[in-house]
Structures are given as structure tokens and as C-alpha cells.
Amino acid sequence: MIIVFILLIIIFVVPFLIYKRKVDDIDLNCDVNPYNRRFMKGEGFVVVDNILDETCRQKLVDTFLDKAKKNKNLNEDVKLNFYSNEHFLKQLSEIVGEDLYPVNSLDLQRCWIRYYFEGMKSQYYENYHHDIKRYGGDVKQYRLVIPVYDTSDTMFTINGHGTFPFEENMGVFLEASNCLHKVEFKRGERLLLIMDFINKSCDNRLSHYTCRNFKGYFNWLRDVAWRNLSSVYYKIANS
């Protein structure tokens, strides 16, 4: 009984105590390319060509590519200023068709860099899967994936909508739990910028609870465990 009580405190009380709003302080002065072209849209997804302006894309490559090649971490959290910038969020909102906001600061899946290299073991991402939704039914959660550097032969498949080459500076918005997809590549390397957004303002201490239903809270716990375990696994498997 004592063990159960301690677990409940860890699960429900500790997050309230440790919450601290994240400060996105890496300023790369990025912007969305005004000439981007939306070429595919369906239930749970939007695909856009040339989503970032070229200066922004190159800054991301110059800042993160060499570091990613050296440490070969699957995920590297980055506090990019434009992730929570109102102007940038407005530009993305216009592409998706609804208002977008940063996720809660207690979410580990927020804004991060992911690096893939030829021959790496990444089996999970080669199978069909949904992105995990960490919020309640009244909140939509989107993941934006952008290959800011890509020399690979990557193919992106959305179940029921076909397969297309996933090329440099493409932007793919995926709604969590509403878009079954997979990504495959055999050759080359890729540096991805990945950002999670929601369509409701939920970044405060209480919103960690009020914006999630029971399933969403369970998925948040699951996501915390998955993020840590998968990073350790891929680090060991690909060392």
C-alpha cells in the first residue's frame, strides 16, 4: 500500500512541483518560406514543399549537423526561439488551418533534432505507427517533421494515401492518433527538425492535468518512458 501511495505521488504530485515553463533561447531568427507549396492534405496530415526559408534551413544545418554526427544521439532537445514565437506559430497555423500553440513544458517531445545515418538501427520508425497523443479529446496534437539536411533515399508512406519521397526542407504535419504512417530509408543521412504543437494554449502548471484526460495522462507517462528508453537503446545499438 505504501508503495502504491509513493507511486501515485510520483505520477501526479511531482510533475506539479517540478513544472517550469521552458525558455526557448536559441535565436536563429528563422521564418517560414512565403513561397511554400502545400501539395497534399488529408484527414490528419498536411504536406508542404520548401517550408522554411533557405537562410533558416542553412542556419539549422550549420548549428546542429556536425554535433549530431559526433554524438549520434537519436534525439537532441533544442530550445529554439522560433518554436514559441507568435509570428512563426501564426505562419504554421495558416498552413494547417487552425491555431497552433507549443505543448506543455513537461512534455519531453517538444522541439528536437533527430539524426539518421546510413546503416543505423531504427526498426520502429520503419513500421506503421501513430504518433502518441498526450492530450484529451478536445485538444488536437500535431507533429511537424522537417528534413533540414537530407542526402537519403527516404520514402514516406501515409496509410491509404500512398508513398512519396521525403525530401530536404519538406514539412509534414501529422495529427497524433489520426495518421498511420511509416518512414523508410536505406542510404544517405538525414537531420530532422521535429516539433510538437497543440491547438489550445496549455503551457502552465494546471494545464498539465486539465488539458489531458486519463488516457492522455497515461500516454504522457508512456511517452516519458519511451523517450528515455529509446534514446538509450539507439545509443547502444548504433555505437
What are these regions (language model features)?
Residues 23-105:
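Non-heme Fe(II)/2-oxoglutarate
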Residues 140, 151-239:
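Catalytic core of Fe(II)/2-oxoglutarate
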Residues 48, 60, 88, 92, ...:
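Hydrophobic beta-strand residues in large extracellular and virion-surface proteins
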Residues 70-155:
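Conserved double-stranded beta-helix
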Residues 1-42, 206-239:
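Fe(II)/2-oxoglutarate
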Residues 51-52, 132, 178, 197:
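A broadly conserved detector of short glycine/acidic/proline-rich loop/turn motifs that flank catalytic sites
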Residues 3, 44-46, 172:
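Generic beta-sheet signal
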Residues 37-39, 104, 133-137, 163-165, ...:
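A general structural signal for short secondary-structure junctions and capping/turn motifs
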